[in-house]
């Protein structure tokens, strides 16, 4: 795989991760301060994991030749 196509693929993945993060936060916010706040706790964990994944993709992009 050429570095150009790898960069494009990683950029697409980064965009998808950002979109998923926004969607997770939107759902979590609907359950915040409700009796179902345990749902928010789980989704906040998912958000943190997605942020970690986004940073990993960014590091991979920086390491491309």
Language-model features: locations:
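N-terminal acidic leader/helix
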Residues: 1-28, 58
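Short, solvent-exposed, charged loop/turn and helix-capping segments
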Residues: 2, 63-64
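Short, charge-rich amphipathic interface segments used for partner binding and complex assembly
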Residues: 26-63
